[in-house]
């Protein structure tokens, strides 16, 4: 059996990464999703173990000390990390694994695993990113401003990625993401 491939999906908050990933997971059975751990509070409707593994800062720091993360980083005041053991299990079973992580984490994965396929997802403009973040109604204006400042840095780094999906039209972006994932699991050039 052929080993799966590691896929990193990154981009600014509000780009639509999660929605596009869910569409790809539904369409491509050879994919698995790596559930990240985080110290941030759950959003309405999020389920522990499905959307994230929600940990206290103390628990998360213990996992760091124990070497349980493939990568971890701090983003907007919260810690996020990829549990290593689950990723390895998926890859060994022949599934390609999607990691949805921020730029710092994506860079760490690229250093550790240069064979990882890196996909950058973004909204068509900073104004659209702002509109989407404000539409969530889950964050303060200060938090939105911090995420927008981070988005500028993230978009500036998009050339570090193998593929870019501009989520300006959901159906088009969805089809593009699914096609990229199909090429990855087939062992081909993704972009």
From Swiss-Prot:
Pfam families per record: Guanylate_kin
Positions that bind ATP: 11-18
Record-linked HAMAP family: Guanylate_kinase (MF_00328)
Occurrences of domain Guanylate kinase-like (ranges): 4-182
Key word GTP-binding present: no
Keywords: ATP-binding, Cytoplasm, Kinase, Nucleotide-binding, Transferase
Molecular function as annotated in GO: ATP binding; guanylate kinase activity
EC number, as in UniProt: 2.7.4.8
Keyword Transferase: yes
Similarity remark: Belongs to the guanylate kinase family.
InterPro entries: GK/Ca_channel_bsu, Guanylate_kin-like_dom, Guanylate_kinase, Guanylate_kinase_CS, P-loop_NTPase
Protein role: Essential for recycling GMP and indirectly, cGMP.
Membrane-spanning intervals of the chain: none
Predominant place of localization: cytoplasm
Name of this chain's protein: Guanylate kinase
Any one cellular-component term (Gene Ontology): cytosol
Enzyme class: transferase
Catalysed reaction, written as an equation: GMP + ATP = GDP + ADP
Subcellular location: Cytoplasm
């Amino acid at each position: 059996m052929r080993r799966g491939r590691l896929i990193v999906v990154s981009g600014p908050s509000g780009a639509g990464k999660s929605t596009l990933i869910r569409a790809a997971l539904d369409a491509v059975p050879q994919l698995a999703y790596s559930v990240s751990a985080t110290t941030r509070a759950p959003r309405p409707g999020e389920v522990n173990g499905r959307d994230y593994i929600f940990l206290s800062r103390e628990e998360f720091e213990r996992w760091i000390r124990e070497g349980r993360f493939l990568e971890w980083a701090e983003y907007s005041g919260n810690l996020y990390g990829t549990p290593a053991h689950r990723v390895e299990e998926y890859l060994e079973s022949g599934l390609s694994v999607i990691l949805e992580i921020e730029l710092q984490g994506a860079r760490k994965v690229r250093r550790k695993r240069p064979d990882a396929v890196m996909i950058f997802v973004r909204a068509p403009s900073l104004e659209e990113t702002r509109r989407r973040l404000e539409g969530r109604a889950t964050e303060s204006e200060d938090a939105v401003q911090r995420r927008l400042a981070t988005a500028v840095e993230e978009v500036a780094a998009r050339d570090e990625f193998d593929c870019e999906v501009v989520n300006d039209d959901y159906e088009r972006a969805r089809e593009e993401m699914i096609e990229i994932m199909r090429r990855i699991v087939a062992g081909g050039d993704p972009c």
